[in-house]
Every structure is written in C-alpha cells, then in structure tokens.
Amino acid sequence: MKYLTSLLLTSATACCGLALMGGSAAAAPTCEDGPIQLGSVSTITGPVDFSDGPSGAKAVFDQLNAAGGINGCTIEYTMADDKGDPQVAAQAARDLIDNRNVVALGGGASLLECAVNAGTYKRNDVLSVQGVGVDPMCFNAPTIAPVNVGPYTLTTAMLDYASNELKNEKLCAFFIILGGTQEAYAQAVKRWEAMSGKTIHLVDMTLPLQGDLTPYLIKARDSGCDAVLTNQVEPGVVQMINTADAQKIEGIDWIFLASGYTEGVAKALPDTRQPVYLGTEWEPYTEVNAANGDWMAVMEKAGLAKTAFSQGGYLAAKVLVDTISSIDGPVTRETIKAKLTEGKPMKYSIAGSDYVFGDAAKHAPMQATKVMQLSGGKWVPRTTDWYVLPPVE
Amino acid sequence: MNSLLASAVAGLSAGGAYAILGVCAVFTYRLVAVVNFTGAAIGAAGTFVMVTLYESGYPLAIGVPAGIAAGALVATWIGIVMTTWFAGASASTKAAVTAALLVGIIAVGLRLTGGQHPHSFPELVTGSAFRFAGVEVTRASLLTLAIAVVFTLVTEQFLARTRTGLQLRALSLRPMAAELIGIRVRLLALCVWAVVGAVTSFALMVIAPLRSPDFMSLSLLVVPALAAALIGAFTSFRAALIGGLMIGIIEGVASGLDTFSQYRGAIPFLVILAVLLWSQRGARWDEAR
C-alpha cells in the first residue's frame, strides 16, 4: 500500500511538476462549489487574431479534465474576446470576475487587455497569468505576470545580442509606436545602455505602421548603422527586408522581435541575402525537440496548430494547474493569490527563465530568449543555448 | 542637403502609387460622380486573387489576368450597388456608402487573406532601373508612374475626342438628362467601374511587393490617394498625378527630418487642408469685401 501511494505520488509529481513548485506533495485542492472557474480576455476578432493563445490554454485544461482533473476538481475555462476594443475588454473582464466568478485569469493573449483591466484585477484581488502580454502594463502591474518575455525585454536582449554576439558597433533602433509604448521602448533601450555601458547610435520612434519604408532604410544606411532593430509585426518584416533588397543595402544585420517569428514571414522571404535575426519568447516553436515535447503532444491531441502563441497559452495553463495543485484546501481567489505571491520559481522546459509571480509591484519574470536566423526560407536556431539577460536592478 | 535629396527620391516609389490611385479616384468622380473610398480595396482584392493563384502554383500569366478580372468584377459589383440604390443620391451620400463598403471589404478581406499574416508577393517587375542620389529607383516604381501618366493622357484624349467620351461626360454632369436622350447610362457606369477595378488591381500588383503585404495596409492607400485627387479638385487628372507624386516626395523628405518625421502620417491631411483653404480663398475674400 505504501509502495502504491508513493508510486501514485511520484507519477502525480511527474505529470504535474509539483516537485518543482516546492509545495507539499500531499496538497489536496478541493472545490465544493463545482468546477474551478478560470478565464482569459484575448483579442480574437478585430484587428488581429490571437486565439491560438487561449485555445492552447484550453487544450491543457480539457486534457486535464478528461484525465479526471486535479484531485477530482475539473476546470471550466472561459475564453472572452476583447475585439481589440478597450470597452469590450473592460466588459469581458467584469463579466469573468462578477458573473463567472473566476478564481484567476490565465492564458490570454491581447493587444490591450492589461492596460485596460490591470485596475479591475487589483480592485477584485484576482491575478492574471497572461499568456502573451503585449502592452507595457502587462509588465508593470502587481496583478499581472506574463509567461512571455515581451517586446520590451526582448528589445534589450536583442540589442545585447547584436552587440555581444554579432559584434555590431553602431546599433540603430526603429520603433512603431502604438498607444503608450514609447516610454517602454525607450526604457528598454536605456536598460541595454546601462547594462552594456555602450550608447545606441540612432533611435527613431516614427516608423509608420503603414507606408513606404524606403526613406527609413536609406536613413539607416546613410547613418552607418551596422544593425537595425525594429518591432515590426509580420507583414512589416517582409516589407522591410524586401525594401532592403530593392535598395541593394549590404552590411546591416536586421533584427526583429518575436512578432516576426512565423513561418509565413520565412516563406515570404525565400531568397533574401539580408542577414535576418530575431528573438523568440520561448523554445522555438518550429523545432521538434524534447523541450517542446509535452506542448507538441498536447497540441496534437487537441488538433490545434503549433504556433508560438499556443506555447504562451499552454505555459500559462501549466502554471495555473501547478499552482492549483499545490493548494491544500479550497481553491479560491485568495488561496491562488497566496500561492502565486509566495514567489516560488517554477521551471518549464519551453521557457528559458523560471516563472515567478511573487509580490513585487511589477513583474517581468521571463528574461531569456533563443535567437533564430532566416536561412533559405526557414527559421534556423542560431544557438542551442538560451540568451539570458542579467536580472533587472 | 544630399540626404534630403536622397529622402525625396526615396519618396518617389510611394508617390507613384499615390499618383495612380489618385488619378483613378478622379476618374471615378468625373465619370460616375462618386468619391470612391473603395478604390484601393478593389485593387487589393484583385491583387490577392493573383497572389492566391500564384501561391497555389499557377503561373503569373494566368494569375495576373485573373487578378485583373477579379478586380474588375469587384468594382462592377460596387458599381451595381451604387447604380441600383444610390443613382439619385447626393455626392456625400455616395461617398458615405463607399466608406461603409470599404470597412466591410477590409473586414472580409482580412478574414479571407489570413489577417496580418504576410503573403509572398511575386514581383511582376524586378530590379532597379537606376541609382540616383544614392537611392535605387526600382523598375516597379517607374512602371507605376508610367501607368499613371499613360492612364491620365489616354483618359483625357478619350473624354475629349470620342463619342463615348462625350456620353460619359454627359453621364457625370446630368445623369437624368443623359438617360432621357437615350444614353445607356447604367451600362456605361458599370464599364467605368470595371476599368477602374482593372487598372487599380494591376497598379497594386506592381506596388504590393514593396508595401506591407496585408489586405488592410493596401486598402488604406486610399487616404493619400484621395488627398492627391483633392489636389486636382476631383476634376484635373494632371493635378492629381502631380499631387500624388508631391505627397510621396514630401513624406519622404519628412521622414528624413527628425523633427517632422513623427507627423509624417498627417501629411495627406495637411495637404487636404491647405488645398481646401486655397480653393476656398476666393469665397472667403469675397465675403470679407
């Protein structure tokens, strides 16, 4: 009997990663009021479709429920759509909190949800394990801790990479500024300058979302940039590299953030000779390896496409499942908050940093990226190691 | 100074695009009396039909004509909507209808073309023609300009010298009277729409590889295009042509100047404002006197 119990415990820890939580293995979460309610607010319809994020989270919960739940407790997961509209985002969050009585949020991927709802989460004492945080508030609120690195930390990391590993001297950065992101990108550049003791050669915050990029590329070339970092999204990456080719620009490393990391971008640029690099949020999703193994298995079982966004949803769901599993007693907003704010590091193979929520006033736990290079219409990992930034002071 | 020249030349490729779309906007307004907000979206639809065929392995010799035909078809469809329900409506109502159609077309287009996911646009004309002030002037931007110039000249001659041209002018000035004297108003109007659709589709196919390759960005090219048309007061093809080029060049210069570059997006609006003030100056001064 004793053998059987320990066997069960071992398998439980193995499957749910309880050991990594450092929590007591005998924890037994209970749910007297029915299934545990979780939810997320994501941009699903509207200007972009980030539904892969929450769908990835849902796949984790569905498969957990099918296997009997956590200590018999199943999870009911509500995916709300903010349509890229702040008002809808606010309503969606209130609906999840007041009507659905969610105990926590997680796995959401939205353009603006953090900025709109951080205050609501604070007032209602509910925490959010954001799947893909985009707006600066995702990384600057006490109630939100995303599982992704985010564009700002990635900016710092990629500048550092360009300077240290690609040996570029004159680094230039061109940013598209949407909403209140200017300050966050400026901070990201400053952080790199403080870290490296170097100064950036040129910063241009006026890159247009739509429009011709030729004048900007000419400016970069004529200013003598060795590397150009931008926060372009998918179509912009393609446009930029095509324009660089049309202008026969040579000798500039083009550096992008995770927003350019899709197979569509790689396929649209099969013949370019420009050196193109970018930093990923997690283990590169295009690679089949052990680190991606569990995520891939979950996605395949759910019949979902394997995208970077689904990694975010998956990882956030894992964090929530492991947090709930470590609770001894009823699963409520309070108990989840207590567990998350303990700030114990949680380790997952698809991320380069340990995930920590903790009780700080703002959170950006993920500080590691893997660098990919475009080669023959494919993204190829440049290194197998994580490129990790030193902790923020 | 040299860098300013480089920025100006760099603005040429955008200018060519604005010019052809601006000329098409004047064309639509003069002949069917519609301020057409869907101009670029029609072209985007045709372009994406071409890209879809190209991506599924068809050669360009099939893809390009099919795309042009698709653009003409979408434009004809909009023409049918306009002539069936809004033939007698005021110009502002018609403009509002096309603005509403634009929103609809973008929404549907984004869904059908996979949202922001980029497509691999084949370059119909590759390479650069020459290098000027350190900037490669691409064959594509020269071709766009050429299309704009040829379209302007041909249309002017056609309207001035042919019988159909005369009928078209009658149609736009007094549609009711034209109908009464036996001109086949509806057929002519639909032909105008089809021509606009075909021309913008081809122009956008040439422009697209160097623009942000998604449906919305291409559709929104209509904003600077309408500014260009306004410079021609929606009547002069040549003024719209030059206006489009000027907007492109001013945008290029502005992005080379740090102080101005963040207001670059506002340039079409500033141009519209300046033109309105200038064109209304007579009325204002007369009143003051």
Where are these regions (language model features)?
Chain A
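Short beta-strand segments enriched in small/hydrophobic residues
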Residues: 34-52, 108, 170-176
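Extracellular/periplasmic Venus flytrap/periplasmic-binding protein
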Residues: 136, 143-248, 284-293
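Beta-alpha junction/loop-to-helix N-cap segments that form part of ligand/metal-binding clefts
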Residues: 28, 35, 49-58, 67-138, ...
